[in-house]
Amino acid sequence: MSNQKKRNFQIEAFKHRVVVDPKYADKTWQILERAIHQIYNQDASGLSFEELYRNAYNMVLHKFGEKLYTGFIATMTSHLKEKSKLIEAAQGGSFLEELNKKWNEHNKALEMIRDILMYMDRTYIESTKKTHVHPMGLNLWRDNVVHFTKIHTRLLNTLLDLVQKERIGEVIDRGLMRNVIKMFMDLGESVYQEDFEKPFLDASSEFYKVESQEFIESCDCGDYLKKSEKRLTEEIERVAHYLDAKSEEKITSVVEKEMIANHMQRLVHMENSGLVNMLLNDKYEDLGRMYNLFRRVTNGLVTVRDVMTSHLREMGKQLVTDPEKSKDPVEFVQRLLDERDKYDKIINTAFGNDKTFQNALNSSFEYFINLNARSPEFISLFVDDKLRKGLKGITDVDVEVILDKVMMLFRYLQEKDVFEKYYKQHLAKRLLSGKTVSDDAERSLIVKLKTECGYQFTSKLEGMFTDMKTSEDTMRGFYGSHPELSEGPTLIVQVLTTGSWPTQPAVPCNLPAEVSVLCEKFRSYYLGTHTGRRLSWQTNMGTADIKAIFGKGQKHELNVSTFQMCVLMLFNNSDRLSYKEIEQATEIPAADLKRCLQSLACVKGKNVIKKEPMSKDIGEEDLFVVNDKFTSKFYKVKIGTVVAQKETEPEKQETRQRVEEDRKPQIEAAIVRIMKSRKILDHNNIIAEVTKQLQPRFLANPTEIKKRIESLIERDFLERDSTDRKLYRYLA
């Protein structure tokens, strides 16, 4: 079969042409034209759309697509010109209604016509790249109605007038507005933008420019912001009701520019109502409104932040440099915490916990807290007050809150080592006097300090707690080996490691014989059980509980310092003693003795002895007797030593000197670490790196760094470069 010849088939063309009636196109078009008229005249109920579709189909099939297309355009144009005259003739409020009515009729007619001309749409128009029926119908409406001279301007003015009326409080037909403006959108984005949106935005800009000027002259800041917020809300609602969604960003930008951006500086600085007034008076609602409005404009929040920062720094500067407000350290710190709480609440409540404002708050507090050189001391005194008495009766959760607030202030300190120095002194007094209200709170704060600054910062503080525990064990051993002492006075000794505790010179004091004997027995016991140790008594740091019987047999237990005990025990053998006799018998230094006597004789309710003559100050000619008339409703009476809560100027200078001495080895260690790593480094870079490395503890003075470099050169840790004197080399 494969060998058979292939047969070729040929299809011949028709020998006779198909003849089309020369008047076919005109006749068919006339049928379609009449149908279009009937559709526009809303008289289409008797039409056969199947027949009309077939007629249009055949015209295209017989190459009369162009005639059909141009005829459709001409007929629709004619109808629209007539409709535009009817719309133009409408008066007053009926103008938009007539326009909307004719627009709806046109759309309905256009849908029917498009269905009839569907074949032309799919073939002829597609192949010739002409505009399809439906968009052409929209274009014709645009050109013959919307852009008709006598309608165009009137339409725009009517719409803008209605928007204006709505803005001043009149009620308008939003449904009609929505339909008419949707017409613009249906006609194309460019039509909506050019014929309505752009003029609308221009008119809105002018409206809000005038209104904002009226408001700024007549309203305070809070009211102005309320009106601005209301206008923004209204414009957003307006978009939702009858504008294109894309217009929201544009119209809100207009309101933001005219109402907020153009008046930012005047608003924040408005006298008696601006930002500072809001901050001072905790106007959270107004502050929140300002934040939400200003965040919408360029540099809005920067403006708010800068004004807040300026106010905070000025307020804080006054707070920490006012001598009156620095008299009480506890109140001083509490004011700082109150201000911090106040602005934390403002930032959380009104500013959405914005990190920009948190950072501004932190930088401001760091700035002004360090303006007062006594801030480290005062913060430590605040802690001391809380841990002595201020935490009684509050929950563990509240204790942690207070300690966290203290740590927050601590982080702001540039001289954390100064705080450490004071904190160690105050902790020592609390531990030795047994006056801390909570060991857990003490240890919790040390853990927080350790987390913040590292082990080195807290190692000595932890050593103090270790000594207290070791001392308890030592005392049990002492009394266990001396059972005969159980009947006499009880001695409790805390053995303190010199390196862990604040060093104080031993103050001379003649202890009463009963106590002195016990002390010697303890010394013998301790040195006998520990080799290579040395004990020195710190009597100025001790306390005593002594029982006293006054004139009419009143019995009290007096909690006193060791010095006060030494003075009071003298009155067991004498009814009357002079200042000189007490001084000679006790050998207590004059300044300490005067404070001691002042506490015993001059404090109301604690005056267990009387002085002659009566006065608040202690003189060297004074005489002292037991106050037989002393009474107290308490059996146990604590007699504190009259002492300034904060350091005196000489004490402050002494502490500062100790701090500076302690810094020297730390600076040298930092220099050596850096040079060991870098080998060669110039002077400026050493200063910068040492400052950065020591910043967590203190702000190193460049002059002191230079001195430490010189000291290290003298001791052959470093050497200067022979050619460049500002270059240093590390010597291994």
From Swiss-Prot:
Family, as annotated: Belongs to the cullin family.
GO biological process terms held by the UniProt record: positive regulation of flower development; response to red or far red light; ubiquitin-dependent protein catabolic process
Subunit structure and binding partners: Interacts with CSN2 and RBX1A. Interacts with BTB/POZ domain-containing proteins BPM1, BPM2, BPM3, BPM6, BT1, BT2, BT3, BT5, AT1G01640, AT1G21780 and AT5G48510. Interacts with SR1IP1. Interacts with NPR3 and NPR4. Binds to NPR1; this interaction requires NPR3 and NPR4.
Gene: CUL3A
Modification after translation (UniProt): Neddylated. Deneddylated via its interaction with the COP9 signalosome (CSN) complex.
Disruption phenotype: No visible phenotype under normal growth condition. Reduced sensitivity of the inhibition of hypocotyl growth in far-red light. Cul3a and cul3b double mutant is embryonic lethal.
PANTHER family cross-referenced by the UniProt entry: CULLIN (PTHR11932)
Domain Cullin neddylation: 662-724
Keyword entries, A-Z: Isopeptide bond, Ubl conjugation, Ubl conjugation pathway
Glycyl lysine isopeptide (Lys-Gly) (interchain with G-Cter in NEDD8) crosslink location in chain: 676
Annotated function: Component of the cullin-RING ubiquitin ligases (CRL), or CUL3-RBX1-BTB protein E3 ligase complexes which mediate the ubiquitination and subsequent proteasomal degradation of target proteins. The functional specificity of the CRL complex depends on the BTB domain-containing protein as the substrate recognition component. Involved in embryo pattern formation and endosperm development. Required for the normal division and organization of the root stem cells and columella root cap cells. Regulates primary root growth by an unknown pathway, but in an ethylene-dependent manner.
GO MF term list: ubiquitin protein ligase binding
Protein name: Cullin-3A
S-S pairs: none
Organism (species): Arabidopsis thaliana (Mouse-ear cress)
